[in-house]
């Protein structure tokens, strides 16, 4: 059906030069003997890998894009990818409707346009593998198997939500699905993901709780803006030092709220930061689910074999503003139309039909099925009860100074403004 992928055939994570900057590449200097930690100890060889599988976004890129051929996918795999991406898109569109109708509160960040990244990575995971997300986490939860009705109920703040209504849009957790969060502040989730990967390695090597597939893998999702934070660099260092089974997935949608990625970092090619820590750095077209899947498969299998972490930069684009409160006035119309024409769902649909993996009517039936799933999720969330007042106190371990918190779950406070503020709780 298709030739071996450019990633697998040309690299296998071993290419020592970036396809996007081959003319500027200089081999790293050997480590001086004085850098050895112990007298007489030879420094360990460093893996210096930076590979661009494709490129589209960054200006000034003169390198030819990677071959368009995809690795073969079966009919079942293609339809699974399509269904998951359509679920993410339709679910997020419904979230926008419900938000503007006053059914959701606070900030709501949608994932439209980035579905190829979530689907391409998460659908390759086992149940025991972990996902750590950001504030843009609804679709990651859906891809990991959290039911749409549980995610929608959480967005509605209902007791039937995956966090019993206490997490909301930016804090999706599900213990049964090993979804370890949504984290509202950028970079917060990366140390959690690194810790989860350490726990997986400890279980495997120390407790001998191994699975036949190898190590459990953790995916850490974060955006381009996070890559200028200290936690990012600290965790890359620790993960490579201990060869942790983790994949760092950068969803580079080119904008950190209203700040262009090209104005926020000294080197906009994030994947090149991987080799600085001795781990592979890979760039992939995040608007193409099949290319993402190729790279994800190799990175996940590499982690599962105990060969350590990988940094993957997925260049993608969000089709809506930063949040539903963002009028999206800073991005140029021609930029938005360029990426709208590269819609990852439309591209996959075209591929499936051209490869005779399914008919258009079969794909329409999937879309109808997902419409029904999302409609049912809204009905379920709307009919679900609000959390009881006493639930607020379940995880409060001390009485805040100045307030009395009774065992009946009701606040008592001398300050009438506080009482007014919590009257509707």
Swiss-Prot record:
Keywords for the protein's UniProt record, in alphabetical order: Chloroplast, Magnesium, Metal-binding, Oxidoreductase, Plastid, Pyruvate, Thiamine pyrophosphate, Transit peptide
Cofactor: thiamine diphosphate; Mg(2+)
Molecular function in Gene Ontology: metal ion binding; pyruvate dehydrogenase (acetyl-transferring) activity
GO BP terms: pyruvate decarboxylation to acetyl-CoA
Binding site residues for Mg(2+): 224, 253
Catalytic activity: N(6)-[(R)-lipoyl]-L-lysyl-[protein] + pyruvate + H(+) = N(6)-[(R)-S(8)-acetyldihydrolipoyl]-L-lysyl-[protein] + CO2
Top-rank taxon: Eukaryota
TM annotation in the entry: none
Chain residues that bind pyruvate: 109, 135-136, 184, 186, 224-225, 253
Transit peptide: 1-66
Keyword Oxidoreductase: yes
Any GO CC annotation of this UniProt entry: chloroplast
Binding site for thiamine diphosphate: 135-136, 184, 186, 224-225, 253, 322
UniProt EC number: 1.2.4.1
Subcellular location: Plastid, Chloroplast
EC top class, as a word: oxidoreductase
Hydrolase recorded as keyword: no
InterPro entries: DH_E1 (IPR001017), PDH_E1_Alpha_Subunit (IPR050642), Pyrv_DH_E1_asu_subgrp-y (IPR017597), THDP-binding (IPR029061)
Pfam families reported in the protein's UniProt record: E1_dh
Subunit description: Tetramer of 2 alpha and 2 beta subunits.
NCBIfam families named among the record's database cross-references: PDH_E1_alph_y
Purpose: The pyruvate dehydrogenase complex catalyzes the overall conversion of pyruvate to acetyl-CoA and CO(2). It contains multiple copies of three enzymatic components: pyruvate dehydrogenase (E1), dihydrolipoamide acetyltransferase (E2) and lipoamide dehydrogenase (E3).
PANTHER family: PYRUVATE DEHYDROGENASE E1 COMPONENT SUBUNIT ALPHA (PTHR11516:SF60), PYRUVATE DEHYDROGENASE E1 COMPONENT, ALPHA SUBUNIT BACTERIAL AND ORGANELLAR (PTHR11516)
Protein's recorded name: Pyruvate dehydrogenase E1 component subunit alpha-3, chloroplastic
